[in-house]
């Protein structure tokens, strides 16, 4: 019998802008990235929205935050707030 080695991998982290903080202990962040069209070679922006766990309700709308992946906390939440990089003005 062959034993499979348990491989630990580094958790992914993202920096994004908070677009919603209406929920208790949860935020929605938008992560923008630039993608090149495969045929026309033009660059355009794509936005991914993630829900993240915010234990102390620190983040507000417009804040730039850093999140990291974690175990699934609910149906749509599998990220955790690490830090608020920049507060909104």
Curated annotation (Swiss-Prot):
Keyword line: Ribonucleoprotein, Ribosomal protein, RNA-binding, rRNA-binding
Organism: Chlorobium phaeobacteroides (strain BS1)
GO biological process, one term: translation
Name the record gives this protein: Small ribosomal subunit protein uS17
HAMAP family in alphabetical order: Ribosomal_uS17_B (MF_01345_B)
GO molecular-function terms, A-Z: rRNA binding; structural constituent of ribosome
Function: One of the primary rRNA binding proteins, it binds specifically to the 5'-end of 16S ribosomal RNA.
CDD domains: Ribosomal_uS17 (cd00364)
Any one annotated GO CC term: cytosolic small ribosomal subunit
Family: Belongs to the universal ribosomal protein uS17 family.
Subunit structure: Part of the 30S ribosomal subunit.
Entries under PANTHER family matching the protein: 40S RIBOSOMAL PROTEIN S11 FAMILY MEMBER, SMALL RIBOSOMAL SUBUNIT PROTEIN US17M
Database matches in NCBIfam families: PRK05610.1, uS17_bact
Keyword Methyltransferase: no
């Amino acid at each position: 019998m062959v034993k499979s080695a348990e491989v630990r991998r580094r958790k992914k982290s993202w920096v994004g802008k908070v677009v919603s903080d209406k929920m208790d202990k949860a935020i929605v962040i938008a992560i923008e990235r630039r993608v090149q069209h495969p045929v026309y070679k033009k660059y355009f922006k794509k936005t991914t929205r993630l829900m993240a766990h915010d234990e102390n309700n620190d983040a507000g709308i417009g804040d730039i935050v850093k999140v990291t992946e974690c175990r699934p906390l609910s149906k749509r939440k599998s990220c955790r707030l690490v830090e608020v990089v920049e507060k909104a003005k």
